[in-house]
Design a protein with these regions (language model features):
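Hydrophobic structural segments
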Residues: 1-277
Length: 277
């Protein structure tokens, strides 16, 4: 089975996109018509991951995040200066004959979300989710016996982290926790303030659920300090039970690519070996 036939099978598994789709998904290196020798699922095609894929005898890297340091994730370097790191990385991929294929938009469009299904599975939180039948980027969990320090320890263990930046009183009990989207300036909203004078940015919606839906703690991806994180810091200093666990974008979604190595073999009929790195 060729690399292109493998990726076509994965696209058939995902919801169909309009033919005009011109997003970040697709090939970033390699020859799609080469025979596939094996697949490595990884969040990011780092130099270390590339070398591990080669050692495993795999020539297809199935990834979720950018290869070459830009948001559009072009397969070439588009700037007015030379990027020697890009050149060396590209040469390494060419040397090993590895194709990089990115699946970001399609897997997030999956229902349920292809990344966060894996995150929830490998955290062991399926039984705690309380809005499993609803769509949207916010997922709620209710725990019978959870504290800030227990959550911190659990996330470190399950995500294989040395430490987590968090806000909260370690002994506070957490009942309702929300896994939320990225907390960046004006993200998900092109016009954060409308005619009624209210702020409509996503961060304000996260504050609303903490105020009105009894959410005690959040686990976001990307963060900035001046919106929700500042709100939570002030809440804690006022003696309220609020917390945030800033695990980081890549750390949060890593388990989703571990999950991909579970479902890809079935989708491709076990045609080639599939590894998670």
């Amino acid at each position: 089975m060729t690399i292109r036939e493998i990726t076509d099978k994965i696209l058939e598994y995902h919801p169909k996109f309009d033919a005009s789709y011109d997003g970040c998904d697709g090939f970033k290196s390699g020859n799609p018509d080469d025979e596939c020798t094996g697949i490595v699922s990884a969040l990011v095609p780092t130099v270390e991951v590339i070398k591990k894929a080669a050692a495993l005898g795999c020539n297809l890297l199935y990834v979720h995040e950018p290869s070459y340091y830009s948001t559009p994730d072009y397969p070439d370097w588009r700037a007015g200066f030379e990027n020697k790191i890009y050149e060396e990385k590209k040469a390494l991929l060419d040397q090993y004959g590895i194709a990089v294929w990115r699946d970001h938009d399609h897997t997030h469009a999956h229902n349920p979300d292809g990344i966060f299904t894996g995150v929830i599975k490998y955290l062991g939180w399926e039984q705690y989710r309380v809005n499993a039948d609803t769509e949207g980027m916010t997922m709620y969990f209710e725990f019978p016996d959870m504290t800030v320090e227990k959550m911190n320890a659990l996330l470190k263990e399950k995500m294989c982290l040395n430490g987590i930046r968090y806000i909260g009183n370690p002994k506070d009990k957490l009942k309702k926790v929300a896994m939320v989207g990225h907390l960046l300036p004006n993200i998900f909203e092109h016009q954060p303030t409308t005619g009624d004078g209210f702020c409509k940015e996503y961060a304000t919606e996260v504050i609303r659920i903490m105020e009105e839906e009894d959410v005690d703690a959040i686990i976001p991806g990307e963060t900035i300090d001046w919106t929700v994180m500042s709100y939570i810091r002030d809440a804690v200093q006022l003696g309220k039970v609020k917390a945030a666990f800033n695990v980081g974008h890549f750390n949060l979604e890593e388990l989703g690519m571990k999950y991909a190595a579970d479902w890809i073999p079935e989708v491709i009929g076990n045609a080639v070996p599939v590894h998670y790195v």
